[in-house]
Each structure stands twice: as structure tokens, then as C-alpha cells.
Amino acid sequence: MMPTIEDNLLCWGKTYDWKDNGDEWSQAWGGTEYLWYGTILPRILSFVPTGNILEIAPGYGRCTQFLIKLCKHLDVVDLNVNCIESCKKRFLDSSHISYHINNGKSLDMIAKNSIDFILSWDSLVHCEADILNSYLSESARILKPGGWGFIHHSNIGQYYNSATRNISSKNIHARAETMTAKLFKEFCDKADLFCARQEIINWGGDILNDCFSVFTKSTIDTHYDTKYLENSEFHKECNRIKNIADFYKM
């Protein structure tokens, strides 16, 4: 079954208890700090620190806590009221954050040509192709020329079987079944964005069910050819970081 905006509202806005503020999803790395410094930051280090950052679907602030130290101003946008309210309380002492509740696909509250870097981690994996298409169209409007984005999204649609009209592999992590790395690049092309990097990974299993896509609103004299990496050993990266975390934790 494909998750809808209503499904995401029900799950993350009402059903899920968020007792650990989302840190429970960092256990494979040994904790959120190890996830951030071992996996996320090395992949975005070319783009931060910077001026204005937008985080899409921050949840309860798992990545937000690090982004606030890497920018002059941070916008956070989430579909769920409870997520935004939690972030407001958690980051009460940070005066350079603006909070927005959206409809799950629009960024109309963000000004044109105002954002240097966009990040979304471990959230849009549950959003179907039409949502990613909308967010990339909006990204083209709000990014400054030369601005960049890093979005973690589903690739499980790669395993769609047209004969059976089903995904041929088990979708144990509730990934959006219409989304693929190929579609992400097509959406970038349509929005006049350059998709510069795509790392297709195995998240919590053996299949290449996820993708990290890096894109830019390039200046007129710059062109990027997409570089691809099929990383079927992403789980080994997580395990290595967790082993280090477990060994050195006191």
C-alpha cells in the first residue's frame, strides 16, 4: 500500500509516541551523534556551514540540533503540528529558527532565491513520487543560484514488477513504492535543477531500497553530470560506526 499524506499525518502526527524524539532510529549507529558525524556530515560537508538552511520534515529535531550550529538562519517545515511544536520547545533558546507547518508538498512560505542548502533525512523515504516532484519544483524556486540540496528518498520503486503490479521485494521499512533514483533525476531535469550525485544504498536489508540525492540550482556557466554510486555495503558503514561508538562509550 502506498503511503498518502493522510497516512503520514495519522502515523507521525497521532499514532507514533515519539518517546525518544526519533533517536530510536539512530541505534544502528550507536546513537544520533554517531549517525550525524559518521554518516550524514561527511556527505554534506561541501555545503555547510552556510547562510540559510531549510530542513524538510525534521520530526522532533534529530538533525535540527546539528543544523542550527551550521547556519545563520534555519527554516524547518513539517506536515505535523506535533513535530513543529516539539522543535519549538526543544530549540527555544535558538532565535535564528523559523517554524512552518505545510500541506505535505508545498514550500510556499519560503521566499524565492533565499535558501543556500536544503536537507531532508529519513523522512521523505515515506513519500511517493508526486510529493518529491512537488518539493523539487519548489526547491528550484527557493534555492539561491549555486545553492544545494541533499534529500534522502525511496528507491524501492526500482523493484516494481509491471506483470504482477507489485514490488518484487519485501518493503519492510515502509518505503514509498512509486519513487526511484531515476525519477528523482527526471524531476530535477524538469525543474531545471542539476542532480549531481546519487548514492543508492541498502537500508536495513539487502536490496537497494533508498537513495541519497544531491542537487543544485546551478549558475548558467556551470554544468554537472550525474555521478552514481551503488553502495550495497551501507550496512557495513553503520556497523563500523556502531562498533566504534560501543567501544569508546564510557
Question: Where are the regions that the model predicts?
Answer:
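Class I (Rossmann-like) S-adenosyl-L-methionine-dependent methyltransferase catalytic domain
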Residues: 1-50, 56-108, 127-134, 148-250
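Conserved acidic functional residues
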Residues: 64, 112, 122
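A short acidic, Gly/Pro-enriched loop at the edge of an enzyme's catalytic core
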Residues: 108-118
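A short SAM/SAH-binding and catalytic strip from SAM-dependent methyltransferases
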Residues: 117-130
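A short glycine-rich, Lys/Arg-flanked "PGG" loop and its adjoining helix->strand segment in the class I
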Residues: 133-145
